[in-house]
Regions:
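Conserved binding/catalytic microenvironments
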Residues: 30-301
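N-terminal secretory signal peptides and thylakoid transit peptides that target proteins
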Residues: 1-16
Length: 301
């Protein structure tokens, strides 16, 4: 998919949700189309691709609107359809939490992630329970991150690939605590889980779980041994899909910081300039934060 073709993405969105009167809340369960969970999952995957290409602010409003509509339908639905809509709503809530984080709205992020966890419990959705724990670990301080990641790993009936994501967050918590041996054990566990036949991660899922493990491994070594991380980041930047424009900017910022920390200041400036050009387009708060850190390191050098 062309990462700059907004019209194509929006047209695909129209196809993902056919002409359904979704702006009006249903008054009875019989009014709800049983295919809605599938349609909303398709739309979620599409909006995730739009976020990858254009950044969080391009989709945040649409995601919040759809979340309200999904909740209205879920409140009226009954039985298996209600449970399916709860699962869909939990996925949309987790994605909305990510968007809030990447827009710099940490308070909104917390509330949305708690909503995802609540819905996952109510719908008996172990993969989302584990995945939301991985997100909690990603955004917490190291000791709390380790507890959240380990709780995710212990989630009964969660798939191997989802638990692999919990293992990567445990590895990163160990890295922030300076424990290289535990990092290696956690990454080895993640590699083992990724190699296991497993259902995919909850939507939206890129299907590139192995690459996600490599990305977190690189971040671990950036904290412990920046010179080692540089080559890992280079490989990731080469292998990431070109449609992941926001991630390209973020990982250029990561490699720039690793270069600065390793004393390769000229390359740090060059990679930072590339990252800045992308961040100005995607308006990713995550990339902006990394670039501010880079600026402080370069100014002090």
């Amino acid at each position: 998919m062309d990462p700059i073709n907004r019209r194509g993405l929006l047209g695909a969105g129209a196809a993902a949700l056919p002409a359904l009167a979704l702006n009006v809340a249903p008054s009875a369960a019989r009014e709800i189309d049983p295919e809605l969970p599938e349609h909303w999952t398709a739309l979620l995957n599409l909006l995730s691709k739009h976020d990858d290409a254009f950044g969080p602010r391009a989709v945040q409003g649409a995601v919040r609107h759809e979340l309200r509509v999904i909740a209205e339908h879920r409140a009226v639905a009954r039985g298996e359809l209600c449970e399916a809509l709860m699962r869909v709503e939990s996925c949309w809530s987790e994605f909305s939490a990510w968007l809030a984080h990447d827009c710099g709205d940490h308070g909104g992020r917390q509330g949305l992630l708690e909503r995802a966890l609540h819905l996952a419990r109510a719908a008996d959705y172990p993969d989302m329970l584990a995945w939301a724990r991985a997100r909690q670990a990603q955004w917490a301080d190291a000791p709390m991150a380790l507890r959240a990641a380990e709780a995710g790993l212990r989630t009964p009936r969660a798939s191997a690939h989802t638990r692999a994501m919990c293992a990567t967050r445990a590895a990163y918590a160990h890295a922030r605590l300076g424990d290289a041996a535990s990092v290696e054990r956690s990454i080895a566990e993640a590699d083992h889980l990724v190699a296991t036949e497993s259902p995919p991660l909850p939507p939206p899922d890129s299907g590139m779980t192995g690459l996600l493990v490599r990305r977190w491994e690189a971040r671990c070594w950036a904290a412990l041994n920046p010179a080692r991380a540089i080559g890992m980041y280079d490989d990731i930047l080469r292998d990431q899909p070109r449609t992941w424009v926001r991630e390209q900017g973020l990982y250029l910022a990561y490699v720039a910081n690793a270069c600065a920390d390793a004393g390769e200041l000229d390359r740090a400036r060059a990679e930072g300039a590339k990252a800045l050009a992308i961040a100005r387009t995607t308006k990713s708060a995550t990339a902006t934060r990394e670039l501010k850190r880079l600026g402080a390191v370069l100014q002090a050098a």
